[in-house]
Amino acid sequence: MKYAFSTLGLPGAPLARSASLAAAHGFDGLEIRAHPEEPLHPGSAAAERAAARRTLTAAGVAVLGVAGYTRVAAAGADEPVLAELRALVRLAADLEAPFVRVFPGGAGLPAAAADAHAVRRLSAGAAFAERHGVRILLETHDSHRTGAAVAEVLDRVARPAAGALWDVLHTWLGGEPPAASRRALAPHLGYVQVKDVRSARELTPVGLGAGVLPLAEAVAAAPRDGWLCWEYEKRWHPAAAELPGGLARGRAYLERLVAAVR
């Protein structure tokens, strides 16, 4: 198993600091939040991307994925969505990252219409991603919270460069047990995103193991040769404790869960 954390937990932090923290606490990689308020995003210049690669190489830390905000199931024209997908794929390729994260975003649409949008756009985006050695991962999130909902889309796309990102919070909120999520997502899974919260109504992040999410079951269902990525949502919950103080405990907790299922 390899371990990463998301830079969502370090809002606005320089990449060098994120990479240093990852290396110091035994994390193999970073999930890079690709938003204009962060150091790296689709608008970053070639020189900035090259500098980022040097920083990461020096720290011995990989980029697991580029976390974008494209909503592939949303209403509207296709071309703006496809342009965002292409930009995210190019950024991932420049950072030597294997994955791009996207959201469904189909709230307010009939399920059939949202699925049709997602299938069409992911099919086109995957064809582009394949040429760059990148996979586009649809996260279990918002309108498609469960593994079953995401798998229904991806089964129709049926391209190797379109896959799934399993966010264990959202499948839990959707009432789907981890074993069922794993069964649904198995043909498509890119990696697993872990986190913890106090309850379904109190989503302020807490340290791994300090909340109510079924993390032991999720880790037991995760592929042994895959990645676990801790997404600590500090950006959306400023009052939450600072991530650096919990990295060592979080990494050790995940390792214990992995060891327990060997």
Name each model feature, range by range:
Residues A16-R17, T55-A59, A74-A164, L173:
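Active-site acidic/histidine proton-transfer and metal-coordination neighborhood
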Residues W227-E233:
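Short acidic/histidine-rich active-site segments
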Residues P36-H41, V72-G76, G106-A112, L173-G175, ...:
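A short acidic, helix-capping loop that chelates divalent metal ions and anchors anionic groups
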Residues A19, G29, V66, S123-V212, ...:
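Acidic/histidine-rich catalytic cores of soluble enzymes
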Residues S44-A50, D78-R86, A114-L122, A151, ...:
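Charged helix-capping and loop-helix junction motifs
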Residues S6-L10, R33-E37, G68-R71, G105-A107, ...:
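Active-site beta-loop-alpha junctions enriched in small/polar residues
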Residues M1-V89, A93, A97, R159, ...:
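N-terminal pre-domain/capping segments
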